[in-house]
Regions:
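N-terminal capping segment at the start of a domain
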Residues: 2-35
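Alpha-helix capping and helix-loop boundary segments enriched in small/acidic/polar residues
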Residues: 6, 89-92, 130
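Conserved hydrophobic/aromatic pocket- or pore-lining residues that grip, position, or stack substrates
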Residues: 18, 48, 121
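Short secondary-structure junction/hinge motifs that connect adjacent elements
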Residues: 25-43, 60-65
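Acidic/histidine-rich catalytic neighborhood of metal-dependent amide-processing enzymes
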Residues: 86, 96-147
Length: 147
C-alpha cells in the first residue's frame, strides 16, 4: 500500500476548532460532563461522521467511530484520545490526538483505502480528574477496570 498523505490544513482546522470549546474566562477548560464538553462531543461526533465513520457510544460512555474492515473477526485497530481537560489545561491536551485519529479515518476515506481490520476512533469519556473525584473513566471501562 502506498503511503497516505493527510490533509494538514484539515487536521489543523480540526485541532483549532476543538480547542475553542472552552469556558470564556478560563482558557482551555472543558470539564467532563459540563456544557462545553457536551457541545465539544457533538462536534467530535459530526467530525467522525464526516470522516465516514459510523458513530456510537459504548457502555462506558466512550464515543467510538468505526470504519469496518474487510475481514470480520479480526481485532480492531484503535486510536484516539479524550475531549475533556483539567481546569486551565493545555490548549491541545487531548485535542491533538483526537483530531489526528479522525484525520487518519478521513485520509483512508479520501483515498478509498480498505483495511483488513476495522478502525475505531475513540473519544474516551472523562479521562481527566473531575469534580466527581474520578478520572480515566472511559479507558478503565474499556479495560474492564471500572468498578
Amino acid at each position: 500500500m502506498a503511503i497516505l498523505k493527510i490533509d494538514a490544513e484539515r487536521l489543523w482546522r480540526r485541532i483549532m476548532e476543538l480547542s475553542e470549546f472552552t469556558e470564556p474566562n478560563r482558557p482551555w477548560t472543558r470539564l467532563a460532563f459540563g456544557e462545553n464538553h457536551r457541545r465539544c462531543r457533538e462536534w467530535v461526533r459530526a467530525q467522525m461522521a464526516e470522516a465516514g465513520l459510523s458513530v456510537g457510544v459504548d457502555p462506558g460512555g466512550n464515543m467510538i467511530g468505526t470504519r469496518e474492515g474487510r475481514r470480520k473477526g479480526l481485532p480492531a485497530i484503535a486510536c484516539g484520545s479524550h475531549s475533556d481537560t483539567v481546569p486551565n489545561g493545555g490548549r491541545f491536551d487531548g485535542a491533538a490526538g483526537l483530531a489526528a485519529a479522525v484525520e487518519i479515518a478521513s485520509a483512508l476515506a479520501d483515498n478509498d483505502v480498505e483495511l483488513d481490520h476495522s478502525l475505531e476512533v475513540i473519544d474516551f469519556l472523562a479521562e481527566e480528574p473531575n469534580e466527581f473525584g474520578t478520572s480515566c473513566v472511559g479507558s478503565r471501562a474499556v479495560a474492564g477496570e471500572l468498578t
